[in-house]
Structures are given as C-alpha cells and as structure tokens.
Amino acid sequence: VSYLIKPRNNMGKCLYCYKKLREGDRDFHPACSQKIFGTKVPPILPYVRNQLADLAEQVIRSQTTLTGVQAKLSLDIHKGERNEPERFTIVGLWGRYILKPQTDLYPYLPELEDLTMHLAEIVRIKVVPHSLIRFQDGELCYITRRIDRRENGTKLPMEDMCQLAERLTEYKYKGSYEQIAKLIQKYSSTPKLDLINFWEQVIFSWITGNADMHLKNFSLYSQSKGNYVLTPAYDMLSTVLVMPEDTEELALTLNGKKSKIKKKDFIIA
C-alpha cells in the first residue's frame, strides 16, 4: 500500500478498496464511504497523533504484545450542523468504531493491518468492516467498525476464547488452536461451518506470517437471541514483516508446536 502513503489528492487511491479514485473524490469512493461509515461523504477525523495522549487518557496499552503497542481509541460519528460534515469524536466504550494510529516503535502498522485484512477478503475470509483513514494532517490510521455494537451503541453479546476457556487475559498466549476448535464445537450454534471458517483463518495467518492470533483474537457473538456464531476475522497483522527476528510462526500451539509448522500439522490437528 505504498501508493497510499502520500498527501491526499483528488486522483489517488481509495483508502477502503485501494482502487483509483474518480475526479472529485477525496480519499474514498462514495459507495466505499457508505459501506464503512454509513454515509457517502466520509466523516472528518479532526485530530493529529500528538493530541491523543491528552484526548484519551483511558487508552489501553500493553508492554508485552505487538498489537498492544498501538493505541486503540473508541470513536463514534457526531452529526454535523446544517451544511457541516459529520466528524469522529473520541468517546467511551460505547463507540461504534475503533481507531489505531501510527506508532513510533513499529512504523506503518495501520497500513500493514489493513493490507492483511484486505488480503483475507481476497481469499474470501469474512472480516470485520475496516479501512484506512487520515488524521487532519494526512497521516494514515487504521479504523474498524465494531461488530458487537448496534447502531444505537448498545452491545451485542460477544465472548472471546479467553473468556470461553475461563482464562485471564494475561494467559491469552497459553493454549492451542485445537482447544479453540473444541470451544467452537461446544458453544457455537453452527459448529461445522464455524470450524471451517476458523481453520481458514488459522491457515491464512500462518501463510501471511501472523504470529499474534491468540485466544482473544477469536470470538463468538450473538446477533439473535441464544444463537452464537464465530465472528468475522479481526486484528489480522503480518507480524513477520514487523518483527522478522521472531522465530515463532503462530501465537498458539498447533500439534504441540509454534514453529516449523508443516502441512501435516494442520491435518493432524
């Protein structure tokens, strides 16, 4: 996505679909903006990165994981006054969007995460709604629409595999993909379909060098009362491009190991 990393202009690439913009479009095709933001004119993101510490004191950070070094901000869309564009505002946990800005430690994480998610879509893996978006100064961020929030901000039931396995968050790297498969078999309302979708996500993560698909990166959620299904894929990131020194190929064990994975390990699992 190097062609996206440049000042905004009227004839660049769409930040949602990566295809060429038409004359008069700004960062998004109207149809693409409608898909991710619900409006043909994309909302303004009226911040720059150095404001975030003051604007979001509740940002969750981790010192031990790659994804944790990214600030994660909860956003929602504020309707503009007459003839004014809509804009994003930082809100509490009820926000319908999550924003991940750039980080000094690992440059271009937003672009890399969006590209990894985009590649997953190309191979027909269902993913959460996502896109790149620009700060006021043109810097790119990653944005995703929460699937566990209704339009009015109320929460849909959603449990990640740490919760289903009754494990604390600090143990999210302690487990196996076979264990997740058993949890899906136990709790999913459509276990056969969800198991296929789950293993496709694991295989894709291995192929793309993603060693961060831990227990909290797989979840079941309920869109209708009493029925739980596997969520679309989220938080997919090719970590090997960011941390090439990491010898582990997977976040959890597969056939008892995290590295030197072979085709037979998937067959045995």
Walk through the language-model features, giving the residues of each.
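Catalytic-core segments of enzymes that bind and process phosphorylated/nucleotide-bearing substrates
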Residues: 160, 164-179, 183, 223-269
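Short hydrophobic/aromatic-rich motifs at helix boundaries and adjacent loops
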Residues: 43-46, 87-91, 153-154, 238-242
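Conserved kinase catalytic-core segment
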Residues: 104-122, 176-242
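Conserved ATP-binding subdomain of kinase catalytic cores across diverse folds
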Residues: 51-172
